[in-house]
Amino acid sequence: MAIAHSPDVHAARRPLCGVLPIVHLPFDAADRIDEADLRHEVDWIFSVGADGLGTGMVSEIVRLSADERARLTERLVEFTAGRGSVFVSVGAESGSVARAHAVAAEQAGCDAVMAVPPMTVRLPANAVVDYFRGIAESVSLPLVVQDASGYVGQPILHAACVELLDRYGPEKILFKPEASPLGPNLSALRDATGGRATIFEGSGGILLVDAYRRGIAGTMPGVDLLDGVVALWRALSAGDEEATYAISLPISAIVALQMQAGLDGFLAIEKYLLVKRGLFRSARRREPVGWSLDDETAREVDRLFDRLAEAIATPCATRS
């Protein structure tokens, strides 16, 4: 049974749309979340034009304790201070834990929750549906159903997505499909739902141009290239093809380097760039990690980052 909530809380909720970065977590020398750097990151996110923010796999969410997750959610709502929508990842290895995370997110003032299926067991389709139904019915918030099988977990069948959408409607159930190949799978989900599904992409920017043309409602990149992704989204919205490809190419080249080492590759390069930008004091990641950035890759990232800065600075890229 869904929890009852006051109409005033529901009316204040902000919709998810546009550029919605997934925050990275700064850690101090004692491996604690550095809340001063986190606040700095959130302020920068909105200063460059993002529409909201959230947590996800690149937030190292599965490496946090339950208490850390709850405190992080509270801090993100506090630091955002009404400047945009806030959503958090609530996926867990059990339905009861996922539901508890979702309830905590609603109580903290989030606008939506997002969840992946359990990652340590391969579930039949009916169990996947039951898992998401449990989360959906535990809160009044919209639920983003995330298929992160391009890098972790199992794919979610389109039939399961259609069942959830039919049961709860498009305002309650949203989607972030990341199964490979992303573009064709995104279109297949769009078509299977008769165009009713609200769909977000999360490729880090490398597939944003293709996904945009297939009808997405927004993108959920990392924060490291956020100014570039905001400029790219604006260029796409304006139909500016020249700016679109000028910005997209260096973003795609950087993300291609990140993809070489899976989630650890993304985290290592993303945090390297956040330190380079002056947003984080440390590129520390929660251990254990399987890959670290080498000097030659870092130099190539630097070259591409300079090219991205040049592309963003051109007049065609900065028009909104």
Q: Residue locations for each model-derived region?
A:
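Conserved active-site and cofactor/substrate-binding residues in soluble primary-metabolism enzymes
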Residues: I33, H40, D67, R71, ...
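Catalytic alpha/beta core domains of metabolic enzymes, predominantly
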Residues: S149-L263
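A short, hydrophobic/aromatic-rich structural module that often spans a beta strand
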Residues: H101, Q107-A108, G194-F200, A298-L308
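A structural signal for short hydrophobic/aromatic patches embedded in well-ordered alpha helices
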Residues: E41, L72, L164, T244-I247, ...
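C-terminal alpha-helical cap/extension of soluble enzyme domains
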Residues: A2-A11, L20-H24, V48, I216, ...
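Active-site beta->alpha loop and helix N-cap motifs at the rims of alpha/beta catalytic domains
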Residues: A2-I156
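Secondary-structure boundary/capping signal
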Residues: G84-S85, L143, K172-I173, A197, ...
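Alpha-helical structural signal in soluble globular domains
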Residues: R71, R75-F79, A104, A108, ...
